[in-house]
Amino acid sequence: MGNQGWAPDGLDDLSDEPPQWIRVGVAMTPPAESIGGSATGPTSAQLDAFCRALAPRVGLAVTAQGFSDYRALLAAINRGDADLAWLPPLVALRSASAGRTLPIVLPIRGGAAWYASALFTRAGSGVSSILDLRGARVAWVDPQSTAGFLVIRAWMRSQQIDFNFAFGQQTFYGSHAAVVQAVLRGEADVGATYAHLDHDLQHVRSAAWGTAHVQIVAMAGPIPNDVLSASIRLPVTTIRAIRDALVRQDEALRVASAGLLNAEGFIAAETEHMSPLMKVLKHLDDTGRRATSIFPAR
């Protein structure tokens, strides 16, 4: 299947046998960094409430199982021991591109289901585009930050931009707030952080810099908040039922989703949400990264 498309309506059933139940897999370790999600890992009570609310909407029993990290969760998916998985965007896309899972819905937080990685500078700094960078001091969040390091660097590689030419001093500041302050105080010429996008996926509606006056130098995305992915072993009719139940939630499922994922709702995962990130996937430099949380580091 590869990455030929994300919408289950366009796929043939890969399994003819209806499942007896649906097994939801989650990584239980608290997140290292979360934007809009929970600051702690999921609880058993929250997982149970979500499963109870989803079950009558899909007409199947729904159970949950916790895993130590995403590698263990994906291994269970590959063995056929889990059917659904909450995944960070990069993990979800790699699994989908390998033909193992299918992204089906994205959670909405703060009115949006995605964000972007933005490279920004102070207003009036004289840097207006990526071509203006020559030995610039750059502020990163940390080596595991999707928006604050990984994605914008991957995008720059895809544009054949030479890091050794563009950047001089490179510093990890540990948080998005610290990156913003480093740029605004003049400690760094540019910094990388998150920016929430409007529904057109082009315009910034809010960002880590708040109301400060900044100049966006480059932006890469959209990046989904996180992704509910289904095993390709599930019949497409079951995947559609799960997708439709989450997109058109009843009150019980809405409350359970808010409790578990801090989600206001869900949208169906479409190719337009995923393809920009897929294009830079091979340029990522996160080899050996071990993600552990139900909510992705951003």
Residue ranges and their predicted role:
Residues 29, 90-91, 122-124, 143, ...:
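Solvent-exposed coil/turn segments that connect beta secondary-structure elements
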Residues 121-142:
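Flexible hinge/capping segments at coil-to-helix
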